[in-house]
Amino acid sequence: MKTEQPMRTHYCGEVKVADVGEAITVAGWVHRRRDHGGVIFVDLRDTTGLIQLVFNPEHQDLFSEAEKLRGEFVLSASGTIRNRPEGTINPELPTGEVELLVLSLVVLNTSATPPFHHNEHAHEDVRLKYRYLDLRRNEMANNLKVRHDIIRSLRNFLDKKDFIDIETPILTKATPEGARDYLVPSRTQKGDFFALPQSPQLFKQLLMMSGFDKYYQIARCFRDEDLRADRQPEFTQLDIEMSFVSEEGVLQTMESMIRNLFQEVLSDPLPDPFIRLSYEDAMARFGTDRPNLGVAMELVDVGDLMRQVEFNVFSGPANDKDSRVACLKLKNAKNITRKQIDDYTNFVGEFGAKGLAYIKVDDISTGADGLQSPILKFLDEKTIHSLIERLALANGDIVFFGADKISIVNASLGALRVKLAEDFDQMNSGWFPLWITDFPMFNWGEKEKRWMAEHHPFTAPKVTTTDELIQNPGEALSCAYDFVLNGHEIGGGSIRIHSQTMQEAVFEIIGIGSTEAEEKFGFLLEALKFGCPPHGGIAFGIDRLAMLMTGSKSIRDVIAFPKTQTANCLLTDAPSQPETDQLKELGLSVRAKK
């Protein structure tokens, strides 16, 4: 009986000097072919790396076959491992000291000329259209391997902590924010629609009510919204819920999990404990609830110094309780140009700021005479001295001011803070994890003219009675928390409402009356009657986490088959028009595009 030869005995990138003299078989793709003075060299690539194949002309048939090889041909090559000749060793390759003298070759498949080379920086649209070729690149393959390592580490940690993995439905009910739901028509109940879940939120709460103590799931979620570099219409999150737990209990467990993850996958230790900031403190100091603590600059309030100045741009907001006057100090900026300042003025304008006042420090020893600014003429000597003292100004500093509604100042200076750090190389390297806590329970929707849940309507308030909540919803804080890493919101969660009366009160405050509440959340309200335990949880964005841990610029680089920023799949050309018969069976018709 003839024994079939294996397609490979070794992986390309794992061949070592210790294998010299061994007869081996490798398989993979032609990465590059070179003809050097009658000897043909082929770099063969597989998932582990490269090995150099050598074809000598004395093996005429093999040499003729090698001459026909082209990029991305698929081969199985057998031969003997030998040391590379002196002067040809490649220290950049793990296999750079050895080569395979080929004695047998099987061409398993040919290839058309690829639309881009492995080392070429092709346009992203081309990469997405030919994603199966893009994923052959080391960078992309490594990204998906790291993603796998991330998920494996998270699973192992939670398994050891007695969490259990439970799947929740993909076909479910539309949410109150239904405009962002992907809808799926029901064939059996014409005119009715399922919605794809934006999160497993209610199902994981129901699992706690069912007596499961600790739950997790690597959940696929869907949201129909405008996309950014770190958003996709379908995304993956690590979903977690725990019973009989406090906010502190959730944060401590999750902090241990994240610290373990970075140690296992990247061998990077994270600080212990993570920094914690209240929402109010984060907004005041950084202008955002997801600050990058790798930037040392902070917003400094100077409104109290500006109430009496004869400069309405400052004094107006300084005397308005809904406004703010704050500033940023950039150090070592003596070479900043007028054009750069104009560019930063335009930049903050994108966030609603009407201008960007500044003071540049040339020689602090001469007081006001050592400062440059068009606004100095509006500020008296006492105010200038107070600014110098409060900001600890030094030569080469420049101070940028924001004076407007609180939201505009926070957004504009918060964004400018990061941009200045990037432009002036003042971004500290490393990992800067933190928790944001004590979020407002509600925010007032100017457009909607009603209170809206800051996180979601199932978040528990810090107050203990419905009367306190109803009397002053604008002052109520929630038991919500976000995990922020280097300026990115990676996770968010809360302690949940476990009282039916409190849940009904929250619905009422955000404009969901009893009829609508019963229609959309009747199953939840009913479940809350039957001994619901205190519970809480969190969800982490796997895509965004993988993006940061691989150093990628977009989550599209850590997803095997992502959508574009217009939610298209360039590989499969989805979404597409359905067949007429499909629509008919569903009882649907499509209006023609105008």
Description of each model-found segment:
Residues M1-K594:
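Class II aminoacyl-tRNA synthetase catalytic cores and aaRS-like
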